[in-house]
């Protein structure tokens, strides 16, 4: 594994115009934890602000750098979907320029995220968690049917070797290793703008796609720690991957890309000592503090909670993260009100809660995090749903009664009982699921304690006997 990663590093430097500092080198960290795989180590002391890796934007795998950018049907895809097709197309070509990079992508068996889990496994290990309804794999399957297959049929010579199975695998890889980088005008796209929209591409005789397509090489197939782009004109965000998450990234300004070498750094938001910056069009990894010889170099994955770490990168942090949260979903509290008021009336009242910023989604889900265990909003929702007449304003805090606190306590108790019991994890999947579950239960128990405290304070005092 280390040898393969070293070969890729050599290729990136010699063939893809990457430069690296002599002060860093690859190291096998599997003895520390299997999820770490291969990472970078400081071979000498490194000073803050030292440049460690640099490369141009034409050295990354993305649609702009691919000859697939000439296809209007591919251009019309979301950035992440276009990147997937580029990756799968390159991987289908034995002579691809990106072969050394593609060869170190994790195999399906080495992907430790729950991307490939079937419904039975999800129910057994993730029931009740934030990830219980995750549909990443199903969404990719639907994308394949609705958007990718028609493109393949339209250009059979170009895409005949692209398989659904490999497209799925590239999805899991991209989820863990992609960056959002600022778009640049490529000769290909400029040419495309001048030509008619129907212009098609001729198949390369040797089957190679242009040098710049995608890849998301993980330093070694097993490393599922994150990589992120931060700094001038760059985004850390890779949360627009699938439709369950709305991206804050402007598709006209940024695009999804795979960056060899940069995605070989393990990531930890707390240990982070390097960052990737865009400096006048050159992407550069810079030390954010002094680093001692022998230290591992850590990129950052941003402010993610444990469920997102597991979903994207296939690992969890034992002690959780400051961003962990739990959901009380509509199905945990709304059914009785729908039965009583009807769906349309409940929906109207949810809209009212949203307008008053007491609820932040029309689905009716409430979020509670480590940092914010405020429960006034859900209690006001109970009060609002109990009203028989149509309302034009939400109730006030004074309308919250002890019965509403007791109702919330019952819901919390039911939520805690929903989780699977994993007392003795037998593998990495069970280990991660157990960590996720314990973190959510901890938040719910803390929430319960705060509600009980409020209930005690608001309990009516018994009338005292007055002796005459």
UniProtKB/Swiss-Prot annotation:
The entry's keywords? Methyltransferase, Nucleus, S-adenosyl-L-methionine, Transferase
* Domain annotation SET: ranges: 22-302
Mind telling me which Pfam families this protein's record contains? SET
Keyword Transferase set for record: yes
Q: Does the keyword ATP-binding apply?
A: no
Instruction: Give each disulfide bond as a residue pair.
Output: none
Subcellular localization is given as: Nucleus
Q: Which residues cross the membrane?
A: none
Alphabetized PANTHER family for the sequence = RIBOSOMAL LYSINE N-METHYLTRANSFERASE 4, UNCHARACTERIZED PUTATIVE METHYLTRANSFERASE
Family named by the database record: Belongs to the class V-like SAM-binding methyltransferase superfamily. Histone-lysine methyltransferase family. SETD6 subfamily.
Name used for this protein in its record:
Ribosomal lysine N-methyltransferase 4
Q: Which organism is it from?
A: Schizosaccharomyces pombe (strain 972 / ATCC 24843)
Taxonomic lineage is:
Eukaryota, Fungi, Dikarya, Ascomycota, Taphrinomycotina
The record's gene field reads set13
């Amino acid at each position: 594994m280390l040898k393969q990663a070293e070969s890729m590093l050599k290729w990136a430097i010699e063939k893809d115009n990457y430069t690296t500092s002599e002060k860093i080198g690859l190291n096998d960290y599997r003895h520390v934890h299997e999820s770490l795989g291969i990472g970078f180590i400081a071979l000498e002391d490194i000073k803050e602000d030292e440049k460690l890796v640099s490369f141009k934007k034409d050295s990354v795998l993305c649609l702009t750098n691919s000859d697939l950018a000439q296809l209007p049907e591919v251009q019309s895809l979301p950035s992440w979907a276009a990147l997937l097709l580029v990756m799968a197309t390159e991987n289908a070509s034995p002579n691809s320029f990106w072969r050394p990079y593609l060869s170190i992508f994790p195999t399906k068996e080495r992907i430790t995220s729950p991307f490939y889990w079937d419904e039975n496994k999800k129910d057994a290990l993730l029931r009740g968690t934030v990830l219980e309804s995750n549909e990443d794999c199903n969404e990719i399957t639907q994308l394949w049917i609705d958007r990718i297959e028609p493109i393949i049929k339209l250009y059979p010579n170009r895409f005949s070797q692209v398989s659904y199975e490999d497209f799925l695998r590239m999805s899991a890889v991209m989820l863990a290793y992609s960056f959002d980088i600022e778009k640049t005008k490529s000769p290909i796209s400029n040419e495309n703008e001048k030509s008619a929209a129907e212009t098609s591409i001729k198949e390369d005789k040797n089957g190679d796609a242009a040098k710049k397509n995608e890849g998301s090489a993980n330093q070694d197939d097993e490393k599922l720690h994150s990589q992120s782009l931060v700094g001038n004109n760059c985004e850390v965000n890779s949360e627009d991957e699938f439709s369950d998450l709305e991206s804050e990234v402007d598709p006209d300004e940024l695009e999804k890309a795979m960056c060899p070498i940069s995605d070989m750094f393990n990531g930890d938001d707390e240990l982070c000592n390097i960052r990737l910056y865009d400096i006048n069009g050159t992407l550069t990894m810079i030390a954010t503090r002094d680093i001692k010889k022998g230290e591992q170099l850590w990129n950052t994955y941003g402010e993610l909670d444990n469920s997102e770490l597991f979903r994207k990168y296939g690992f969890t942090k034992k002690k959780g993260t400051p961003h962990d949260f739990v959901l009380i979903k509509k199905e945990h509290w709304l059914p009785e009100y729908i039965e009583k008021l009807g769906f349309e009336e409940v929906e109207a009242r949810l809209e009212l809660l949203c307008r008053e910023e007491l609820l932040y989604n029309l689905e009716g889900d409430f979020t509670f995090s480590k940092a914010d265990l405020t429960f006034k909003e859900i209690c006001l929702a109970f009060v609002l749903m109990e009203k028989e007449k149509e309302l034009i304003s939400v109730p006030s805090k004074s309308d919250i009664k002890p019965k509403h606190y007791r109702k919330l306590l019952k819901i919390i108790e039911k939520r805690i009982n929903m989780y699977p019991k994993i007392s003795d994890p037998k593998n990495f999947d069970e280990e991660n699921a157990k960590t996720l579950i314990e973190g959510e239960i901890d938040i719910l128990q803390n929430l319960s304690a705060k509600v009980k405290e409020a209930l005690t304070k608001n309990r009516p005092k018994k009338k005292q006997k007055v002796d005459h």
